């Protein structure tokens, strides 16, 4: 394709969040003219950011996307490695469950700082222009036209070759695509909300072990804590909304934490706990699925706009960043031909993003309940053992999702296959132990004892002579044995 044509391509990126700003970097490298429209003010100058601010877990997929635009080292240097889950039981006991091998870890990063860094990186490209406080009013993908409303309150029509919807779970771009025939959409609010709390530094250092994702699992709800660069921890309490609604006073909150998170109170402090708890109401969590992710060659959805997921597998940002990376790889493959790239992008990403959405739902149950069980710990130890002796044959689900770029839906399929293999292996092992035990029992048992086992009615005589079994009960058993022997 002629380079002058490529340079004339104009792209409107709707949304200047994590995925939107990263996608602007990817597209700017292709010499497209990029305009990013963000409804909020510039987060780098905002005095207070309201709403979602859950700490993020950056893993392999996200790092590969950042690496492709030359930002991996910068972002990684601002993250804190977390090598394992640290489980806090109700009794105060702590136990670590490694994520993978000693060299494998995820990174705790600040959403706010990461967004600022990505915006700054995008603005460094001369062909990128940021438009803050610009809200999308209309989107007409057939004609490649959008209407935006800036701070001057005057609607402005903008024409472009490609509209990229990166405007989050409540995407305006997606809402316009939903009016098109054969566009499928579903959403689900889970019955749990989240609330953020803070564990401040203690004597200038971390109040807990910093290189862990701390979890307080309590079956129907849980709390997690991720470390920050300033030696604090950001805690997130996930709980059904009806439970949040029961905590109306300061005493209610303190009593609740004393009952379910007693070891967290001295870490947070009662005063700060109450202050943070009533600062903002519990926030909802939504899961969104749609199909397809594109419309002709003029519009595409990325990140939460295409597949908002609950945060319990730590893959929301990573999946969104991988969207950008896959899109970039396809643009290379098809030489920037959007008519070829967009349909393949939808075909590849829809099964993967739906798979990680389902896994995230499943992982909430695992995090809040299963991690307490001995069987769960046994399974994790077995997975690590099998992976150690057969690294290319047996790969734990978490490793496939977090430390590789195996496609999400393929990871799920492989996980189900591996579970079947393990279950069959355990059944075979159990059967072998049972048969071996029976053989040894028979082989070393005296003939007289063996004869008693073969003839159940002889047991009755044995009970009559050696126990204080009631006589009437023995007589009843004799009657049954006589029927059996006939």
Swiss-Prot record:
Its EC number is 1.14.13.9. L-kynurenine binds at residues 85, 99, 363, 398. Keywords: FAD, Flavoprotein, Glycoprotein, Membrane, Mitochondrion, Mitochondrion outer membrane, Monooxygenase, NADP, Oxidoreductase, Pyridine nucleotide biosynthesis, Transmembrane, Transmembrane helix. Glycans are attached at residue 465. Optimum pH is 7.5. Its main location: mitochondrion. The chain crosses the membrane at residues 385-404, 425-445. It is found in: Mitochondrion outer membrane. It is a multi-pass membrane protein. Pfam families: FAD_binding_3. One of its GO terms (molecular function) is kynurenine 3-monooxygenase activity. Its cofactor is FAD. GO terms for biological process: 'de novo' NAD biosynthetic process from L-tryptophan; anthranilate metabolic process; cellular response to interleukin-1; cellular response to lipopolysaccharide; kynurenic acid biosynthetic process; kynurenine metabolic process; L-kynurenine metabolic process; L-tryptophan catabolic process. Pathway: Cofactor biosynthesis; NAD(+) biosynthesis; quinolinate from L-kynurenine: step 1/3. It catalyses: L-kynurenine + NADPH + O2 + H(+) = 3-hydroxy-L-kynurenine + NADP(+) + H2O. It comes from the Eukaryota. Highest levels in placenta and liver. Detectable in kidney. Increased in neuroinflammatory conditions. Inhibitors are investigated as potential neuroprotective drugs since they lead to an increased level of kynurenic acid, a neuroprotective NMDA receptor agonist. Transmembrane domains are required for enzymatic activity. This is Kynurenine 3-monooxygenase.
């Amino acid at each position: 394709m002629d380079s002058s044509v490529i340079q004339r391509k104009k792209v409107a990126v709707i949304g200047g969040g994590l995925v939107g700003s990263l996608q602007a970097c990817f597209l700017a490298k292709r010499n497209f003219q990029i305009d990013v429209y963000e409804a909020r003010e510039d987060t780098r100058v905002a005095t207070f950011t309201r709403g979602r601010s859950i700490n993020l877990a950056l893993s392999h997929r996200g790092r590969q996307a950042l690496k492709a635009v030359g930002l991996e080292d910068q972002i990684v240097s601002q993250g804190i490695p977390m090598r394992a889950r640290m489980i806090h039981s109700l009794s105060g006991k702590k136990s670590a469950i490694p994520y993978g091998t000693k060299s494998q870890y995820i990174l705790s990063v600040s959403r706010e700082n990461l967004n600022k860094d990505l915006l700054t990186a995008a603005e460094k490209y001369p062909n990128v222009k940021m438009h803050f406080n610009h809200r999308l009013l209309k989107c007409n993908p057939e004609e490649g036209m959008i209407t935006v409303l800036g701070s001057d309150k005057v609607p402005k029509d903008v024409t472009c070759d490609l509209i990229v919807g990166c405007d989050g779970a409540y995407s305006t771009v997606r809402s316009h695509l939903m009016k098109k025939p054969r566009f499928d959409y579903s959403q689900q609010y889970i019955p749990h909300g989240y609330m953020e709390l803070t564990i401040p530094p203690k004597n200038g250092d971390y109040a807990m072990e910093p290189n862990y994702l701390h979890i307080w699992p309590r079956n129907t709800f849980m709390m997690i804590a991720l470390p920050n660069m300033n030696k604090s921890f950001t805690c997130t309490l996930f709980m059904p909304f009806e439970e949040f609604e029961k905590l109306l006073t300061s005493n209610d909150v303190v009593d609740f934490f004393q009952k379910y998170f007693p070891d967290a109170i001295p870490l947070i402090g009662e005063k700060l706990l109450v202050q943070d708890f009533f600062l903002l109401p519990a926030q909802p969590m939504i899961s969104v699925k749609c199909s397809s992710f594109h419309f002709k060659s003029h519009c595409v959805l990325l990140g939460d706009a295409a597949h908002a997921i609950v945060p319990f597998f730590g893959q929301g940002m990573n999946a969104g960043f991988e969207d950008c990376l896959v899109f970039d790889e396809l643009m290379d493959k098809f030489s920037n031909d959007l008519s070829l790239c967009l349909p393949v992008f939808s075909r590849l990403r829809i099964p993967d993003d739906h798979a990680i959405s389902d896994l995230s739902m499943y992982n909430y149950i695992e995090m809040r309940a299963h991690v307490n069980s001995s069987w769960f710990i046994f399974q994790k130890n077995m997975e690590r053992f099998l992976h150690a002796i057969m690294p290319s044959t047996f790969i734990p689900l978490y490793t496939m999702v977090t430390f590789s770029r195996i496609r999400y839906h393929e990871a799920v399929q492989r996980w189900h296959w591996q579970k079947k293999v393990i279950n069959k292996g355990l059944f075979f092992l159990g059967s072998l132990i049972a048969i071996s035990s029976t053989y040894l029992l028979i082989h070393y048992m005296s003939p007289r004892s063996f004869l008693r086992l073969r003839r159940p009615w002889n047991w009755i005589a044995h009970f009559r002579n050696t126990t204080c079994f009631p006589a009437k009960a023995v007589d009843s058993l004799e009657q049954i044995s006589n029927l059996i022997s006939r």
